[in-house]
Regions:
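Cysteine-centered catalytic environments shared across enzyme families
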Residues: 1-331, 343, 347
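Glycine-rich active-site loop/lid subdomains used to bind and stabilize high-energy intermediates
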Residues: 46, 151, 210, 300-489
């Protein structure tokens, strides 16, 4: 994990140390190295966490002719193969780091290079001779990148709060984004909760040149059904998982696996343990209460693969209240995910033992593992029954007593039956509607602009989704902004 930031054109007199103060606000992302590039036309800063090539690869990295500069957060898994291809085209390399491969690739293929990179990245590339800045983000938005346009100038950084360091960036709430938060429990990209600050969408590049800003999508997911058997599909999935984990095991620093005991992280551990030449470290958190604690499962998995296992009991005397403000600070934007708390303490436990940790995040989206995804499939069958029958079933379900469980069976049944009366995408958002909670009502009451963005209106995400034709095979993968809490830790 690294941090990048910058803005074209040197600041006004008196702002000369701003890029250094922005980099200082990102220091937790890159504790190993800090560097800057400044010219009469741009200020760039980078903080680096060294994972590959610990001796070279400091950033910003400048091309041999001094014209092109790169700041980069991420990892390019196929950089070795691309290095050979670029060497055959006449490029020479001074380091073994993937940053230099990305720089050479951009000089060779311009923005077409991004489709050649397999990995996770947020990158800024500056051409001094052309006065041209290009920002780009990986296919799924694993690495974050925020930007703001003020007049003729562009400002960007790996974290939203880093932009606040610059005196030109105001802190005004975007009420439409606030409505999105109460509807979805997070703010989907490209919006942020701050008016005028945007997330660069996944799979996009953005160009600033001659005071003009343009953006273009360079990758888009495409559903291409294949006529293969279940056995063939499983073999292909296993091979792709094996390759993906193998590429993530490449590291010049200690590496471990976050293990929850579920299928996701256990699968990652399997492919890591069967390909690693050293004993792996695993890290887990446990809870009181059978409903949440997966301790028996992750201990069994860790024992089976013989890992060097580390476990943290969250019921110990941990300063949860004291850590809360720091956790929120790292999240940049509000997200109604209580999992941020155990992830924070898990990261704190991991850091003394490993610099890099693999996790099973994203598998539920890939494998339709959430209950709402199954509800979509069941609802499709339910819609084949008469509407009158569905309404009678809903009436009967409302007679069931309310349970004291967090999400009881009767709640799920009522939401499911009422959702079966709605169009498919609108029903998906209906399963658990946060905007109906008391927390959202005062905001809607005090700000008519927010009230008008209800799902029945035209501005809220649910309303937009209900009008968008569904793509075959897609559930609701939240790929508007893929970076997660642990990525910012």
């Amino acid at each position: 994990m690294c941090g990048i930031a910058g803005f074209p054109y040197r600041e006004r007199p008196g702002y000369g140390d701003t890029i250094r103060r922005i980099a200082a606000s990102l220091a937790h992302r890159g504790p190993d190295q800090q560097g800057f590039f400044e010219s009469p036309h741009i200020s760039l800063g980078a903080v680096r966490l060294k994972v590959i090539d610990l001796t070279d690869g400091d950033q910003p990295l400048i091309s041999d002719d001094g014209d092109t500069v790169i700041t980069f957060n991420g990892e390019i898994y196929n950089h070795s193969a691309l290095r050979v291809e670029l060497e055959n085209r006449g490029h020479k390399f001074r380091t073994q780091c993937d940053t230099e491969v990305l720089l050479a690739g951009f000089r060779e293929w311009d923005t077409e290079c991004f489709s050649k990179f397999r990995g996770m990245f947020a990158v800024a590339l500056w051409s001094e001779s052309r006065r041209r800045l290009v920002l780009a983000r990986d296919r799924l938005g694993i690495k974050p990148l925020y930007y703001a346009v003020r007049g003729d100038n562009l400002y960007f950084a790996s974290e939203l709060k880093a932009l606040f360091v610059h005196p030109e960036i105001a802190r005004n709430i975007d009420l439409t984004a606030l409505s999105s938060f109460f509807s979805l429990n997070y703010v989907p990209g490209p919006s942020t909760l701050v008016d005028g600050i945007r997330k660069l969408p996944p799979g996009y590049w953005l160009e600033w040149r001659y005071r003009a800003v343009t953006a273009q999508r360079w990758w888009q997911i495409r559903m291409q059904p294949r006529p293969w058997s279940e056995t063939e599909a499983l073999e292909e999935l296993a091979e792709r998982l094996r390759t993906a984990v193998s590429e993530n095991l490449v590291s010049d620093v200690p590496l471990g696996v976050w293990l929850s005991g579920g299928l996701d992280s256990s699968t990652i551990l399997h492919f890591a343990a069967t390909q690693s030449s050293t004993r792996l470290k695993t890290f887990s958190v446990s809870f009181n209460g059978r409903r949440f604690d997966e301790g028996p499962w992750f201990r069994k998995v860790a024992g089976y693969y013989g890992t060097d296992h580390h476990e943290l009991d969250l019921n110990e005397r941990l300063d949860l209240a004291g850590a809360f403000e720091r956790i929120v600070w790292h999240c940049d934007e509000p997200g109604a995910d209580a999992g941020a708390v155990p992830v924070w303490f898990l990261a704190q436990m991991t850091r003394p033992h490993a610099t890099v940790a693999l996790s099973g995040e994203g598998m539920d989206e890939l494998m339709a593992g959430y209950a709402t995804y199954r509800a979509d499939a069941y609802a499709a069958a339910m819609r084949r029954t008469p509407v009158a029958l569905r309404r009678k079933l809903l009436w009967a379900a409302r007679l069931l007593p309310v349970s004291n469980q967090k999400i009881g069976f009767e709640y799920k049944l009522k939401r499911f039956l009422s959702g079966s009366l709605l169009p498919p995408l609108e029903a998906h958002f209906h399963w658990r509607p946060p905007e109906t909670t008391p927390a959202g009502r005062p905001v809607a009451t005090e700000h008519p602009g927010v009230r008008d963005l209800s799902p029945g209106g035209g501005g809220a995400p649910r309303a937009r989704a209900s009008r968008r034709p569904p793509e075959p095979g897609i559930f609701a993968v939240g790929a508007d902004d893929g970076h997660t809490v642990d990525e910012n830790l």
